[in-house]
Swiss-Prot record:
Location of the protein in the cell: Cytoplasm
Gene3D superfamilies in the cross-refs: Glutamine synthetase, N-terminal domain, Glutamine synthetase/guanido kinase, catalytic domain
GS catalytic domain residues: 106-358
The name this protein goes by in its record: Glutamine synthetase
Family to which this protein belongs: Belongs to the glutamine synthetase family.
A single cellular component GO annotation: cytoplasm
Enzyme class: ligase
Keyword terms: ATP-binding, Cytoplasm, Ligase, Nucleotide-binding
Record text on subunit structure and interactions: Homooctamer.
Region spans: Disordered: 38-66
GO molecular function, one term: glutamine synthetase activity
InterPro entries: Gln_synt_N, Gln_synt_N_sf, Gln_synth/guanido_kin_cat_dom, Gln_synth_cat_dom, Gln_synth_gly_rich_site, Gln_synth_N_conserv_site, Glutamine_Synthetase
Chemical reaction(s) catalysed: L-glutamate + NH4(+) + ATP = L-glutamine + ADP + phosphate + H(+)
Length: 358
């Protein structure tokens, strides 16, 4: 095993300029991540320097066998925390050979929204709180839970410490540091209300970069749990009953919201979000109806409600924002399995581009 570990950690920089690029893309479910690696002649610093590539879409549920080639376009580069050195992770999106985005490519539509001049001038900031649950591989039961049984009631686990309250901290800390190494703008972690559930935060990041970073952070997390022999679940309600679900609360602000008088801009934006509540809910993650019940710090899925410091609301405004008259708000509706390209761009589209008077 020591030899294998030595080879895995082999430093190639002293013998070759060649690097390994791990191309990452989203698979056929819209939630599964796939990746494969290729050798490049030397270090690169921009996605435009990278070649496009292809994969067998019939094996990912994204193309028929008789016309299976899907083309991936490099979009964002991150340092590889697993291979280290000059090796890189490359976030890609997927297209047909004719250059059309395939149905699971939500990045292309998001990029159009974020490149709109009206959106660009607002310099949209996002801070996304990604919750997830760690599961025992052989049983699909949360880490730290007795097999076929339940731990004590919720209460001591949120931000808890101790062997009877925090399960999987090594994984969480490894992920935190790996994301920082990679260049993901990860801003924090914490244990969640349900035991075995954790959260990491990404942001504030501007525009589509926030979504790229969430996807790469998810990829890094999946790779780390693979090493540990643990399964990560993004199911919004992994355990039925009196247990918290898992969300991806999305904090958002625009330039005008962050300036003097921004609170009025925030209230107008929230009004627009309320008018398009059904459209947003439909795009905010599969199975979200199991989570948004009006209990466990959620609003009912059929009701739009906003409030200051109200964690039972659809949209929460912080006390500091109310006091200062400017700042940001939190959309608490997105599920943990949401597509960040969809959620971030839809919030921008509704609050900046959508005319609720037309």
């Amino acid at each position: 095993m020591a030899l294998l570990s030595d080879l895995v950690n082999l430093d190639l920089s002293s013998i070759t300029d060649k690097i390994i690029a791990e191309y990452i893309w989203i698979g056929g479910s819209g939630m599964d991540l796939r990746s494969k690696a290729r050798t490049l002649s030397g270090p690169v610093s921009d996605p435009s320097e990278l070649p496009k590539w292809n994969y067998d879409g019939s094996s990912t549920g994204q193309a028929p066998g008789e016309d299976s080639e899907v083309i991936i376009y490099p979009q964002a580069i991150f340092k590889d925390p697993f291979r280290r050195g000059n090796h890189i992770l490359v976030m890609c999106d997927a297209y047909t050979p004719a250059g059309e985005p395939i149905p699971t490519n939500k990045r292309a539509a998001a990029a159009k929204i974020f490149s709109n001049p009206e959106v660009e001038k607002e310099v949209t900031w996002y801070g996304i709180e990604q919750e997830y649950t760690l599961l025992q591989k052989d049983t699909n039961w949360p880490l730290g839970w007795p097999l076929g049984g339940f731990p004590g009631p919720q209460g001591p686990y949120y931000c808890g410490i101790g062997a009877d309250k925090a399960f999987g901290r090594d994984i969480v800390d490894a992920h935190y540091k790996a994301c920082l190494y990679a260049g993901v703008n990860i801003s924090g972690i914490n244990g969640e209300v349900m035991p075995g559930q954790w959260e990491f935060q990404v942001g504030p990041s501007v525009g589509i970069a926030a979504a790229d970073q969430i996807w790469v952070a998810r990829y890094i997390l999946e790779r780390i749990t693979e090493i540990y022999g643990v399964v990560v679940s993004f199911d919004p309600k992994p355990i039925p009953g009196d247990w918290n679900g898992a969300g991806a609360h999305t904090n958002y602000s625009t330039k005008t919201m962050r300036e003097e008088g921004g609170y009025e801009v925030i209230k107008k934006a929230i009004e627009k979000l309320g008018l398009r509540h059904k459209e947003h809910i439909a795009a905010y993650g599969e199975g979200n109806e199991r989570r948004l019940t009006g209990r466990h710090e959620t609003a009912d899925i059929n009701t739009f409600l906003w409030g200051v410091a109200n964690r039972g609301a659809s949209i929460r405004v912080g006390r500091d924002t109310e006091k200062e008259g400017k700042g940001y708000f939190e959309d608490r509706r997105p599920a943990s399995n949401m597509d960040p390209y969809v959620v971030t761009s839809m919030i921008a589209e509704t609050t900046i581009l959508w005319d609720n008077k037309s």
